[in-house]
Structure formats: structure tokens, C-alpha cells
Amino acid sequence: MQKTSMLTKEEAIKNRKWYLVDASGLVLGKLAVKAANLIRGKNKANFTPNQDCGDHLIIINSDQVVLTGNKKDNEFWYHHSQYMGGIKKTSGRDMINKNSDKLVFNAVKGMLPDNRLSRRLITKVHVFKNDKHNMEAQKPTLLNWS
């Protein structure tokens, strides 16, 4: 009978890679699902659910991501200023124009499980509004998710 082998932390860190994804023309939800699976390491043969075995991901052109249906006008994001009556509402169109990197980051974060491991995993996502990023030193591999 074969023994089950577990991935060690050192092996997971040693086998980490950097990937680059161009988000222009991609649907936000589909991009978030694929990104969450990549940073969790579900694409690897030695995936372990309780280990951080995923890769780093750089997402560029987040301002060109696509919201399907009427989400640009009918979906809203809320936040509060902590003052009385200080609730703020932002539409999808405004989120893409002003905070598209935050929109993509929060979509990926929402696709991860709610536990301590996900707080470590989300640090491996790097989102940029345009095609300029400061991660050239890591030599990322370009992924084509179109």
C-alpha cells in the first residue's frame, strides 16, 4: 500500500511561479474564478487544500474588464464613512472608471474560502489598471485566458 505524500512548505515555495494575465476583454467573474484557482494551486498535481501551494499572479489592464448584463448600471458597491448617514454607493460603471484594480482584487478575494489561508493567498495577487507594472524582475509567464 502506498503512503500519502504531503507537500512541504519548502517544496511549495521552491516551485512557485509568476504568471501575467491581460484582463482586457475578459468577463470579471470568469477571470476571478481562474485567478483564485491559480493562486490556490488547484492546477498542480500536488495540490494540498491546507497548504499555500499556489503561484503569484499579475493582472494588468483591469480597467478594460467586462461586466456582463446590466451590472454597470444596476449593481452597486457600498461602503460607509463611519459618520451618521455616511453610506456611500458606487455603480459598476464608476468602479471600472475609478477603482478597477480594487474591483478585480475584491472579485478574486470573494472567490477564495473564508479562512486564515486565504488571507495569505490573496497577497499573491497583484492588480494594475493599465499595462505598466513593476514586476518585470520576476520574469512572469504570459497566460492567455481569452
Curated annotation (Swiss-Prot):
Give each disulfide bond as a residue pair.
none
Q: Which Pfam families does the entry link to?
A: Ribosomal_L13 (PF00572)
Q: Which family does it belong to?
A: Belongs to the universal ribosomal protein uL13 family.
InterPro entries with a match to the protein in the record: Ribosomal_uL13, Ribosomal_uL13_bac-type, Ribosomal_uL13_CS, Ribosomal_uL13_sf
- The domain of life is Bacteria
Give the CC-aspect GO terms.
Answer: cytosolic large ribosomal subunit; ribosome
Q: What is the lineage of its organism?
A: Bacteria, Bacillati, Mycoplasmatota, Mycoplasmoidales, Mycoplasmoidaceae
User: What terms describe the molecular function in GO for this protein?
Assistant: mRNA binding; structural constituent of ribosome
**GO annotation (BP), single:** negative regulation of translation
How does it associate, per the subunit comment?
A: Part of the 50S ribosomal subunit.
Does this UniProt record's set of keywords contain Ribonucleoprotein? yes
| Stated role | This protein is one of the early assembly proteins of the 50S ribosomal subunit, although it is not seen to bind rRNA by itself. It is important during the early stages of 50S assembly.
What's the protein here called? Large ribosomal subunit protein uL13
- Which UniProt keywords are given for this protein, alphabetically ordered? Ribonucleoprotein, Ribosomal protein
